[in-house]
Amino acid sequence: MDVSQLTDAELRDSLKSHGVSVGPIVATTRKLYEKKLIKLSDGSINNQSNLNDSQFNEDSLIISSSPKKSPPQRVFQNVSAATAAATTSPESDSDDCEESMRYLTEEEMAADRASARQAQSNKGGFLGSTITFTILFVFIAVFAYFLIENAEQLKLVAETNPEDTI
């Protein structure tokens, strides 16, 4: 069997039939998946779970009782292919890392364009924004004028009554 001639979907299906969890097949991952399939079809890997991720079981931690200080040995239990297949559904979009989409009909595109035009016409245009900006500028200018006038009066009051300070 020539693995390089398989399409991405055929490669994915054949790997899934061997119990291998398959991610997206792109140019960078295709050769890796082809090698896995060749090893599986040749029978050089008898245990399929070596290709899948292993799951660490905390109960199976073994600590060596030797006098030298060596790091503890960890025992990993492999997840069976049936358990791995049961946790992911083959029909979900996340298996292929693709999102579903559909083409819009002409009526839907026309309705979308009409709502975009409606939203833009409700903005008020250039004249409305100019009037709003002018009113805001006048309000800020009047506020600044009264602030400066009152600051001068407060300064004069503070200078005439020096005995009020402690």
From Swiss-Prot:
It is found in: Nucleus inner membrane; Nucleus envelope. Coiled coil: none annotated. Residues 62-99 are annotated as: Disordered. Residues 149-166 are perinuclear space. SMART domains: LEM. PROSITE patterns: LEM. Residues 1-44 form the LEM domain. GO terms for biological process: chromosome segregation; mitotic cytokinesis; nuclear envelope organization; response to X-ray. Ubiquitous. Expressed in all cells, except in cells undergoing spermatogenesis. High expression in hypodermis, neurons, pharyngeal muscle, body wall muscle and gonadal sheath. InterPro entries: LEM/LEM-like_dom_sf, LEM_dom, LEM_domain. Interacts with lmn-1 and baf-1. This is Emerin homolog 1. It comes from Caenorhabditis elegans. The gene is emr-1.
